[in-house]
Each structure stands twice: as C-alpha cells, then as structure tokens.
Amino acid sequence: MARISGVDLPRDKRVEVALTYIYGIGRSSAKQLLEQVNVNPETRVRDLTEEEISRLRDLIDKEYKVEGDLRREVSLNIKRLIEIGSYRGLRHRRGLPVWGQRTRTNARTRKGPKKTVGVRRKK
C-alpha cells in the first residue's frame, strides 16, 4: 500500500482516482501530477514501482499544500474572516450559507436538522 502525505492510497484503484484520497488533490490536479512525473493514469496503485511512488511523494511535498497544512490554512482563513467582522465571517459564525444561497426554506446542511417552533394561541 502506497503512503503519500500521511494517507494510505487504496491498492485496487487507478492512481488517478487514488490520489484524490489526499485532502487538497482533486481529479484535475491528480492528472497534472501524473503528467509531470510521467506515470500512466490507468495504472493501479499496486502496480506502481517504488521509484514512481517516491517521485510522486517528492512532487507533492514540494509543490502542493495538502492535508494538515491546507486544513490549517483554511481554518485560519475562516478565523480571520470572523475576527475582522466581515459579512462572510458573520455567516460562518452563525452557521449559515456563506455564498448567498436562500435560507428561508433550504440550507439544511449548514443549519442542521429542523427545530420545530411551537405556535402560541390566544386563550
């Protein structure tokens, strides 16, 4: 099993797909990576040589911000937005959608499960 940036890549998947298990590497950056190190994207992870794995590992370490470093940067960016009191920071703080989606009916992913509000009737 190939281990790159602290992530065990699944042996039975194609390299192009397996690289996306690393936080910060998607399909397009995986394709670029494989092109740079001259590895066929159709190759299975179990068929990679040690040399190919080390070339991939070196390139990712040198040129890509992945896993812990990227997660830290994202959380610091969100913290900064909250501290400066921007609109985006306010939305993050309240747990609402940040990019302008409607919230009257949808936005359940950000808001969490429905909280039923009781109705008060006159006596």
Curated annotation (Swiss-Prot):
GO molecular function, one term: tRNA binding
Keywords: Ribonucleoprotein, Ribosomal protein, RNA-binding, rRNA-binding, tRNA-binding
Source domain of life: Bacteria
Subunit field text: Part of the 30S ribosomal subunit. Forms a loose heterodimer with protein S19. Forms two bridges to the 50S subunit in the 70S ribosome.
Cited InterPro entries: Rbsml_uS13_C (IPR027437), Ribosomal_uS13 (IPR001892), Ribosomal_uS13-like_H2TH (IPR010979), Ribosomal_uS13_bac-type (IPR019980)
UniProt name for this protein: Small ribosomal subunit protein uS13
Comp. bias (Basic residues): 105-123
Organism: Desulforudis audaxviator (strain MP104C)
Task of the protein: Located at the top of the head of the 30S subunit, it contacts several helices of the 16S rRNA. In the 70S ribosome it contacts the 23S rRNA (bridge B1a) and protein L5 of the 50S subunit (bridge B1b), connecting the 2 subunits; these bridges are implicated in subunit movement. Contacts the tRNAs in the A and P-sites.
One GO CC annotation: small ribosomal subunit
PANTHER family: 30S RIBOSOMAL PROTEIN S13/40S RIBOSOMAL PROTEIN S18 (PTHR10871), SMALL RIBOSOMAL SUBUNIT PROTEIN US13M (PTHR10871:SF1)
Entry keyword annotation includes Phosphoprotein: no
GO BP term (any one): translation
Keyword Heme attached: no
Gene this protein is translated from: rpsM
Family of this protein: Belongs to the universal ribosomal protein uS13 family.
Pfam family, one: Ribosomal_S13
Region (Disordered): 103-123
